[in-house]
Amino acid sequence: MKVRASVKEMCDKCRVIRRNGRVMVICTNPKHKQRQG
């Protein structure tokens, strides 16, 4: 899980979602998991 100020999709499998008011990226590749913070 990467914590970043700006979250971006890194591949075509990445999806930007909102969870509990947080912007997150979920992906089949665990290296691409990100959270805004």
Swiss-Prot record:
Q: Which UniProt keywords apply?
A: Organellar chromatophore, Plastid, Ribonucleoprotein, Ribosomal protein
Q: Where in the cell is it found?
A: Plastid, Organellar chromatophore
Question: Which coarse location class applies to the principal site listed for this UniProt protein?
Answer: plastid
- UniProt KW Ribosomal protein keyword: yes
For molecular function, the Gene Ontology terms on record are: structural constituent of ribosome
| Listed GO biological process terms | translation
Listed GO CC annotations: organellar chromatophore; plastid; ribonucleoprotein complex; ribosome
Q: Which InterPro entries does the annotation name?
A: Ribosomal_bL36, Ribosomal_bL36_sp
Concerning PROSITE patterns, the annotation shows: RIBOSOMAL_L36
Q: Which domain of life is it from?
A: Eukaryota
Say if the entry is tagged with keyword Transmembrane helix: no
So what family is this one in? Belongs to the bacterial ribosomal protein bL36 family.
Recorded protein name is Large ribosomal subunit protein bL36c
Q: Give the organism, scientific name.
A: Paulinella chromatophora
